[in-house]
Amino acid sequence: MVKVYAPASSANMSVGFDVLGAAVTPVDGALLGDVVTVEAAETFSLNNLGRFADKLPSEPRENIVYQCWERFCQELGKQIPVAMTLEKNMPIGSGLGSSACSVVAALMAMNEHCGKPLNDTRLLALMGELEGRISGSIHYDNVAPCFLGGMQLMIEENDIISQQVPGFDEWLWVLAYPGIKVSTAEARAILPAQYRRQDCIAHGRHLAGFIHACYSRQPELAAKLMKDVIAEPYRERLLPGFRQARQAVAEIGAVASGISGSGPTLFALCDKPETAQRVADWLGKNYLQNQEGFVHICRLDTAGARVLEN
């Protein structure tokens, strides 16, 4: 039996639309991510468990884990009879890389079960392909950090899909999921087809400056440059209370904040534990909309997807 855990991730990080993402893990030790188990069997089967299992498609072939198994078998050129179990701990359409968690855990578990026939680069390419079936286009800003850990910059040149960017140990990521769903496809459709020249220049300056600040170890500068002129101005209308929440967490002391992925999760970066707790308390009282919402104080998950049992 192989059991793989794949962590939540926060894509875009305001400054890097479709090209930056970070894997995150709660500081209290909770597992914020999906778990997939693979066991040898006579025929294929898929069982769904976990807090958000009831939100998965009722038709097994529509489940992304089934599609991962099917695509992995196609890649190897043979049918691999296994019993798979998806522990769905991540809310769907949350902006926390929910589909990426399932895809990464499923493909990594299949690869481990079969003796690692695929290298990490090929496996990551498959992960991007499968995640793209849900989001509507292939992009790696969730699957890459989820699989490899840390903060990842998408390269997609010279057979390099992504490379790690150094993060800051003092940064605490407060993630607030309000309990509502935002479709990634819908959040992409709301974006303009073309952008003004000054917005393109600002975006390039912010992203280049952010990467420079990470490598030159300037956390204050990095946080200041986490600005979004590409998606947030258009997507915030999909997120009730987002603008007020951003203003509130800034007043409390967050050094940066924005939309995690395509939302509705809000992320707020803090450089002090007491500030992070105050931000988390405010968001828990004011940004959550129902019982399914949650707030976690997290750090970067530098390990990425990992085998829990083998």
From Swiss-Prot:
The keyword Transferase applies. SUPFAM superfamilies: GHMP Kinase, C-terminal domain, Ribosomal protein S5 domain 2-like. It is an enzyme of class 2 (transferase). Keywords: Amino-acid biosynthesis, ATP-binding, Cytoplasm, Kinase, Nucleotide-binding, Threonine biosynthesis, Transferase. The keyword Transmembrane helix does not apply. Belongs to the GHMP kinase family. Homoserine kinase subfamily. Catalyzes the ATP-dependent phosphorylation of L-homoserine to L-homoserine phosphate. Is also able to phosphorylate the hydroxy group on gamma-carbon of L-homoserine analogs when the functional group at the alpha-position is a carboxyl, an ester, or even a hydroxymethyl group. Neither L-threonine nor L-serine are substrates of the enzyme. This is Homoserine kinase. It comes from Escherichia coli (strain K12).
